[in-house]
Amino acid sequence: MNNRVHQGHLARKRFGQNFLNDQFVIDSIVSAINPQKGQAMVEIGPGLAALTEPVGERLDQLTVIELDRDLAARLQTHPFLGPKLTIYQQDAMTFNFGELAEKMGQPLRVFGNLPYNISTPLMFHLFSYTDAIADMHFMLQKEVVNRLVAGPNSKAYGRLSVMAQYYCNVIPVLEVPPSAFTPPPKVDSAVVRLVPHATMPHPVKDVRVLSRITTEAFNQRRKTIRNSLGNLFSAEVLTGMGIDPAMRAENISVAQYCQMANYLAENAPLQES
């Protein structure tokens, strides 16, 4: 039997499809999401409706974003979900979540079992809409969740950690084994909750500057920041901010990266493109 076939659908490798089928895990995720009637619930990648059905049962209306046209068509004719669903058959990577929140008149509650091949770039896409999002619950590769929640002085800490924690409070929810999926992925999975900060703990003047600094620092993470960020900051400037130029990218806190971004935004602002 082809273990890529589930409920008559052949999982497509190019879409990174792995279908959740463990009822205990499904119940645990739905409990963590705790959907309520009247909320603007949005699912990314509903697939074969493992989460869509139990979430949809609790709601009068549910919005889903599904790239796979066959799966979108199945959802349209779903016996009890069909009338409740608003289906966008398009790529979540290009979806305008801000427009949807405006249309629905409230911040979105976004959830999904995300395709692992696009999970990191999709996170960055969603971060640009945190003003329009109340919270997010995602199943991700465990390694990605570890990176999202990592603190300084750890191998997992990187650009994704800094940017995620700049925008959101990041909370791990549960770990999920490969056996919970068809076909089983080659990696462990985990569920994470991301709640955009109501008030930014470390506001920056220009988030593009923060993005640039973290990209340059972590692209050369084995170098000291005296070297990796030498084109942006002198050792004297870093020392003046209380940041040791001999530290590496992984030793610098989110607050310190934001401090550096604000210094650069004031003293060498990016030109509008």
Swiss-Prot record:
The keyword GTP-binding does not apply. PROSITE patterns: RRNA_A_DIMETH, SAM_RNA_A_N6_MT. It is found in: Cytoplasm. SMART domains: rADc. InterPro entries: KsgA/Erm, rRNA_Ade_diMease-like_C, rRNA_Ade_Mease_Trfase_CS, rRNA_Ade_methylase_Trfase_N, rRNA_adenine_dimethylase, SAM-dependent_MTases_sf. It comes from Escherichia coli (strain 55989 / EAEC). S-adenosyl-L-methionine binds at residues 18, 20, 45, 66, 91, 113. Signal peptide: none annotated. Specifically dimethylates two adjacent adenosines (A1518 and A1519) in the loop of a conserved hairpin near the 3'-end of 16S rRNA in the 30S particle. May play a critical role in biogenesis of 30S subunits. It is an enzyme of class 2 (transferase). Belongs to the class I-like SAM-binding methyltransferase superfamily. rRNA adenine N(6)-methyltransferase family. RsmA subfamily. GO terms for cellular component: cytosol. Pfam families: RrnaAD. This is Ribosomal RNA small subunit methyltransferase A. Keywords: Cytoplasm, Methyltransferase, RNA-binding, rRNA processing, S-adenosyl-L-methionine, Transferase. One of its GO terms (molecular function) is RNA binding. Its EC number is 2.1.1.182. It catalyses: adenosine(1518)/adenosine(1519) in 16S rRNA + 4 S-adenosyl-L-methionine = N(6)-dimethyladenosine(1518)/N(6)-dimethyladenosine(1519) in 16S rRNA + 4 S-adenosyl-L-homocysteine + 4 H(+). The keyword Membrane does not apply.
